[in-house]
UniProtKB/Swiss-Prot annotation:
GO terms for biological process: translation. The keyword DNA repair does not apply. HAMAP family: Ribosomal_uL29. It comes from Guillardia theta. InterPro entries: Ribosomal_protein_uL29 (IPR050063), Ribosomal_uL29 (IPR001854), Ribosomal_uL29_sf (IPR036049). One of its GO terms (cellular component) is chloroplast. This is Large ribosomal subunit protein uL29c. NCBIfam families: L29 (TIGR00012).
Length: 65
């Protein structure tokens, strides 16, 4: 969903949307870590991608308040 949004679209999100998205991304990161720990096949680039998106969203949220 939000992985295809650019920064202008991310800035238009409300605080609740940002919080929901960050929570969802953190859950996905946790699931990726579990898959890695159990030696399932994963796509390593997703770790970096999700972490960067979380950082972007939290930065936008802090700028708004």
């Amino acid at each position: 969903m939000t992985t295809n949004l650019d920064s202008t679209q991310l800035e238009k999100l409300t605080d609740t949307d940002i919080n929901d998205t960050v929570l969802k991304l953190k859950k996905e990161l946790f699931e990726l870590r579990l898959q890695k720990a159990t030696r399932q096949e994963i796509k390593p680039h997703l770790f970096k991608q999700k972490k960067k998106l979380i950082a972007k969203l939290l930065t936008i949220k802090s700028k708004k308040s």
